[in-house]
A protein has these predicted regions:
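Short-chain dehydrogenase/reductase
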Residues: 1-134
């Protein structure tokens, strides 16, 4: 583990939908270093991820080395294929796994972060999208 102190810092890890990928491991490492962590999850996977969390199916994976439980400060619907909501075709926006998720675009998540935490409140951004644009 890196010896780094991120206490008081906020991170957004894009590409977390379960406990099996690099994004989840990076999220844990950031939390271990003291950061508050938000994640962006692909809208079609978000409901499943929320259910796994709610039912405690990820509890063992959420355990940090100091005994704390990893807590996501926020979980945002994020589809990085779309810079703005207008870029998403209507047939995508109308799909049941998208339509009630608000603005799931990159711009939408950035705006939501500003609304939730204020301007300049994000210190670390991690791109960990399995199939997303770079």
């Amino acid at each position: 583990m890196l010896s780094i102190d991120l206490t008081g810092k906020r991170a957004l890890v894009a590409g977390v939908a379960d406990d099996g990928g690099f994004g989840f491991a990076i999220t844990k490492a950031l939390a271990e270093a003291g950061a508050s962590v938000c994640v962006g999850t692909w809208p079609p996977a978000l409901g499943i991820f929320e259910t796994l969390l709610r039912r405690g199916k990820l509890d063992a994976s959420l355990a940090l080395s100091d005994g704390r439980k990893l807590e996501f400060e926020r979980i945002y619907a994020l589809d990085a294929d779309f810079d703005t909501l207008e870029d998403a075709p209507e047939e995508v926006r109308a799909q049941k796994r998208y339509r009630d998720r608000g603005d799931f675009s990159i711009e939408g998540v950035a705006n939501q972060l500003r609304e939730d935490f204020g301007e300049g409140s994000l210190d670390v951004v991690v791109h960990s999208l399995a199939n997303g644009p770079e």
